[in-house]
Amino acid sequence: MAVGVFDSGLGGLTVLDAVQRRLPEVPFVYFGDNAHAPYGVRDADDIFALTCAATERLWAEGCDLVILACNTASAAALKRMQESWIPRDKRVLGVFVPLIEALTERQWGDNSPPREVAVKHVALFATPATVASRAFQRELAFRAIGVDVEAQPCGGVVDAIEQGDEILAEALVRSHVEALKRRMPHPQAAILGCTHYPLMEATFQEALGPEVTVYSQANLVAESLADYLARRPEFVGQGTESKFLTTGDPRSVSNKATQFLRRRITFEAA
């Protein structure tokens, strides 16, 4: 059995780390499309094509269930994939819904009509493509009413993180938070809508202030995945080996990933 985890680069490792801790008995195959990262500046058709190609590669590794641990892919490609492309014996899941369920205090799989929730003013920090897709607002509307979402495209943050430039990443985060707060001075909650951003969570929190609740995705996705596999064990695939695949240079990606997770990670060429 194996589950696939896909990201355009290294950000999905934050999700992988959480799901491995939650489900230590499950092998995970991680696919990073580092050669084409970042996705956040690409158009929807390009993101769709790249995400489909990566998903097929994970299916070939015996992963019948693939987690898109990439908000840009979840926002720009997932709905189209589910409507027209994914075969009936496979599943591809995104990372938005567990986050929204936590924000709206709904149980996993609660499909009751949308209702009023306590949080009325939400700041969304995401890549330009995720912001342009309005996928977060669309998913939120299925579950809650009366919530004002102010979205801030965070250009450059993913590139800085992928390049290991923490000083630049912190400066960019502060700049983007300042830009959002000019439009929404008092958000109650902030969504880190990119799986790279948990690495900058302390910077986001400091810039936003202690009164703002910051929601990060990794642990929420891990809990949701555990629940999903308990309900749908038939989608645990036939793969038996955990591995890391990349379209980039395996040595370079391995070194960055090792710094990222602070444990030795070895990528193979996809």
Curated annotation (Swiss-Prot):
GO terms for molecular function: glutamate racemase activity. Substrate binds at D7, S8, Y39, G40, N71, T72, T195, H196. The active site is at C70 (proton donor/acceptor), C194 (proton donor/acceptor). It catalyses: L-glutamate = D-glutamate. InterPro entries: Asp/Glu/hydantoin_racemase, Asp/Glu_race, Asp/Glu_racemase_AS_1, Glu_race. GO terms for biological process: cell wall organization; peptidoglycan biosynthetic process; regulation of cell shape. Belongs to the aspartate/glutamate racemases family. HAMAP family: Glu_racemase. Its EC number is 5.1.1.3. It is an enzyme of class 5 (isomerase). The keyword Secreted does not apply. Keywords: Cell shape, Cell wall biogenesis/degradation, Isomerase, Peptidoglycan synthesis. Pathway: Cell wall biogenesis; peptidoglycan biosynthesis. SUPFAM superfamilies: Aspartate/glutamate racemase. This is Glutamate racemase. Provides the (R)-glutamate required for cell wall biosynthesis. PROSITE patterns: ASP_GLU_RACEMASE_1. The keyword tRNA-binding does not apply. The gene is murI.
